[in-house]
Amino acid sequence: MTAKTAVVFSCAHSDPSTGNERFDWLGELIYEVNPSYIIDLGDGADMRSLNTFDTRYPEAIVSQNYEQDINCYNEAMDRLRKKPSERKYKRPYWIGFEGNHENRIKKAIAHDPRLQGDKYGISFSHLQTDHWFDEYHEYTNSAPAIADYDGISYAHFFSSGNYGTAMSGLHHANSLLANRNHSSTCGH
């Protein structure tokens, strides 16, 4: 069995109010490590424009813009994939997971279907996950997808109980092992 190398990252929260230079640095690391596959555990897009908690604060809403959120995310994904040099690299396999911040798009459409539209509305397709990832795992049954690679389970978060809330606690790793009995990696 050949050993595989993975680069796993999560919760990049690309946001128009913050520079995307960090994605250049992560991209350089990715090409330096030259992994077999890369796993993005979700929340790559902050999607502050669809944050329902900010509706109480009008000054927070004014600075938010859906188009800027989408453009910032796609620029970040592009920066991750730029080669730092002309050296030959083997192309890694890119695996992505939908996080709760990306899921804000689907929630907004479910709340008000009139918002949906590929050209003039909001749409999950604007994230271009089919372009950025070889394999992408969307939420299923209102919870993050779980996928196994090389004997390890990956998800944006693992649910605790039947309510779909994220497993948490003082000793999160211990809770994951105790409840899942399996090697697991999550973001959130």
How does the language model describe each region?
Residues 11, 43, 99, 187-188:
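Active-site glycine-centered loops adjacent to acidic/histidine catalytic or metal-binding residues
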